C-alpha cells in the first residue's frame, strides 16, 4: 500500500510538471522522475559469500605466488654508475683515495680556487661570525648582509642592473625558467642543454619545441613554425633557452646569430652561463664578453658559483623587474633555506680575486690549449678516440671514433670507456665518464669528460696526455 501511494504521488507530480513546465524544465524534471523510480525499484546489492579456503588451498596459492620486483633490474651500466670513490683528502690538484694520491681531472675547478688559503680564511671568519647556516629562506629571516653584498658584487661583475642569489646552482635555472614561462607559453630549447635546464623547461608546463644543437637553420625553422598567423594569431610569450658553454658537449652557443633572430622573431632569451662565467672572455664575464656583446641583450642570465668560484649556489642577472619577480615567484628562492653565509663570503672573495688577478684566466686558457693540442696532435689518441669539444672549453669530451663505437649498444661503449678510466687510475690519474640520468631528453654519445684547471702545471698536463694515450691504446687495441 505504501509503495502504491508513492507511485501515485510520482505520477501526480509528473503530470503537474508536464502541465506547468517549459520545455527545458520538462526534460530535466522528467529525468529526475525516472531516476527516483530507478532508485526505488532496483534490487539491493548483496555481496557474494565466498567459500572459505581450506588450509591446503591457502598453502597452494602461497606456493604459486611470485612477487613482482619493487624496482626494475639494473643493467650493467646502472650497476657501474653506482660505484663510488670515497675521497679522503683534497689538496691542490690532487685527491687521496684509499690512501693513494691521484691527479684530479674529474672536478670542475676552473680557476683552481678550491682550498685557496685566502678563501678558506674568509670562510672560517664567516663561520665564527654567522654560524654554518642561515636558518631560513630569504623572505623569512634568512637574508644576511653578506647575501646582499654578493648580489651587488655579482651584478657589478656581470655588468647587469641587478642579480638575485639562489642557494643551489641546480635550482637556479630550474626555478628561473618556470617562474616566467607558464602554461600556454612557448619555449624553444637547444637539444644540447644539460639536466638542470631540462628540468626547468619541464616544470614550466609550457609548449616545448627543440632545435638541433647549435643549428641556426633548424632554430629558424622552429621559430617560423611557432609564428602563428591569421586566425591562429594571438599574443603568446616565447622564450629561447640556451647555455653559454654546453657542459654536455664543450661547445659554445652562436650568440650573435641568436640575437639577430631575437630582434626578428621577438622572443625572450634565457642563457645559463654556469660553465662560461670565469672561463670565457678577457676578464671571465662569460659568453657575452667573449663575443663583445652587451650583457643586457640577454633577458635572463643564470650562472653558478661552484665551477669557477669554488663555492656553492647560483645567481640570476637581469633587469630590476626580472630580479624582483623571482623574489616572489622563484620556487628555489622562496622555499629554500638561503645560501650559508660563509659560502656567500667565499664567492664574493673569489670574484674579487679574479678581478684583481686576471692572470688566473690566462693560465686557464693556456692549460686548455696545451691539453687540447696535446691530445689532438697526430697519434696522441692513436686514431681510437676523438675530441668533440672546442679548444676554448675547459670541459673536454673524448668519444670513441665511429669505427670503434657500437652504436647499437650504448652500454658496451660506456663499459669500454670505463676500462680506460679504471686503467688511468692505475697510473695515478683520476678521470670520469660523462654520466647522465635516464630521464634526460637527449642523452649525448658516451664520452670521457676532462675538466681543466688553471693550477695544473705544464708537467702535469704532459703526464696526463701520456697516461691517456697509454691507457687508450691498452684498452681499445685489445678489444
UniProtKB/Swiss-Prot annotation:
Pathway: Lipid metabolism; sphingolipid metabolism. InterPro entries: Aminotransferase_I/II_large, AON_synthase_class-II, PyrdxlP-dep_Trfase, PyrdxlP-dep_Trfase_major, PyrdxlP-dep_Trfase_small. Its main location: endoplasmic reticulum. It is an enzyme of class 2 (transferase). Residues 1-16 are lumenal. Residues 38-479 are cytoplasmic. One of its GO terms (biological process) is sphingosine biosynthetic process. Forms a heterodimer with sptB. Belongs to the class-II pyridoxal-phosphate-dependent aminotransferase family. This is Serine palmitoyltransferase 1. It comes from Dictyostelium discoideum.
Amino acid at each position: 500500500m505504501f509503495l502504491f501511494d508513492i507511485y501515485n504521488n510520482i505520477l501526480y507530480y509528473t503530470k503537474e510538471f508536464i502541465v506547468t513546465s517549459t520545455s527545458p524544465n520538462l526534460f530535466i524534471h522528467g529525468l529526475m522522475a525516472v531516476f527516483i523510480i530507478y532508485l526505488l525499484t532496483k534490487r539491493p546489492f548483496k555481496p557474494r559469500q565466498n567459500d572459505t579456503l581450506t588450509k591446503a588451498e591457502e598453502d597452494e596459492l602461497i606456493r604459486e605466488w611470485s612477487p613482482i620486483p619493487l624496482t626494475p633490474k639494473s643493467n650493467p651500466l646502472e650497476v657501474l654508475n653506482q660505484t663510488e670513490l670515497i675521497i679522503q683528502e683534497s689538496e691542490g690538484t690532487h685527491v687521496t683515495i684509499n690512501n693513494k694520491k691521484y691527479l684530479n681531472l674529474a672536478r670542475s675547478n676552473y680557476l683552481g680556487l678550491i682550498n685557496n688559503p685566502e678563501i678558506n680564511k674568509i670562510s672560517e671568519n664567516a663561520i665564527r661570525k654567522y654560524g654554518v647556516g642561515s636558518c631560513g629562506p630569504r623572505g623569512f629571516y634568512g637574508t644576511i648582509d653578506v647575501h646582499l653584498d654578493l648580489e651587488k658584487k655579482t651584478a657589478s661583475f656581470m655588468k647587469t642592473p641587478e642579480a638575485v642569489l639562489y642557494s643551489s646552482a641546480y635550482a637556479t635555472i630550474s626555478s628561473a625558467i618556470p617562474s616566467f614561462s607558464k602554461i600556454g607559453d612557448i619555449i624553444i630549447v637547444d637539444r644540447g642543454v644539460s639536466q638542470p635546464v631540462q628540468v626547468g623547461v619541464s616544470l614550466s608546463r609550457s609548449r616545448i619545441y627543440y632545435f638541433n644543437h647549435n643549428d641556426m637553420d633548424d632554430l629558424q625553422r622552429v621559430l617560423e613554425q611557432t609564428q602563428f598567423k591569421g586566425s591562429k594569431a594571438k599574443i603568446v610569450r616565447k622564450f629561447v633557452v640556451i647555455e653559454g658553454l654546453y657542459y654536455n658537449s664543450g661547445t659554445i652557443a652562436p650568440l650573435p646569430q641568436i640575437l639577430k633572430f631575437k630582434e626578428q622573431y621577438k622572443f625572450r632569451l634565457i642563457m645559463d652561463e654556469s660553465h662560461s662565467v670565469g672561463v670565457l672572455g678577457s676578464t671571465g664575464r662569460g659568453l657575452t664578453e667573449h663575443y663583445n656583446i652587451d650583457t643586457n641583450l640577454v633577458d635572463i642570465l643564470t650562472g653558478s658559483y661552484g665551477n669557477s668560484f669554488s663555492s656553492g649556489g647560483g645567481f640570476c642577472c637581469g633587469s630590476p623587474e626580472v630580479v624582483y619577480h623571482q623574489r616572489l615567484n622563484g620556487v628555489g628562492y622562496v622555499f629554500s633555506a638561503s645560501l650559508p653565509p660563509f659560502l656567500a663570503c667565499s664567492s664574493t672573495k673569489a670574484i674579487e680575486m679574479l678581478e684583481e688577478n686576471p692572470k688566473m684566466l690566462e693560465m686557464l686558457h693556456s692549460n686548455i690549449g696545451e691539453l687540447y693540442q696535446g691530445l689532438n696532435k697526430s697519434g696522441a689518441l692513436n686514431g681510437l678516440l676523438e675530441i668533440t669539444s672546442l679548444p676554448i672549453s675547459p670541459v673536454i669530451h673524448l668519444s670513441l671514433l665511429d669505427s670503434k663505437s657500437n652504436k647499437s649498444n650504448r652500454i658496451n661503449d660506456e663499459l669500454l670507456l670505463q676500462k680506460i678510466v679504471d686503467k688511468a687510475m692505475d697510473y695515478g690519474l683520476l678521470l670520469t665518464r660523462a654520466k647522465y640520468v635516464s630521464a634526460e631528453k637527449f642523452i649525448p654519445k658516451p664520452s670521457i669528460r676532462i675538466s681543466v684547471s688553471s693550477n695544473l702545471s705544464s708537467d702535469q698536463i704532459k703526464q696526463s696526455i701520456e697516461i691517456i694515450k697509454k691507457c687508450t691504446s691498452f684498452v681499445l687495441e685489445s678489444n
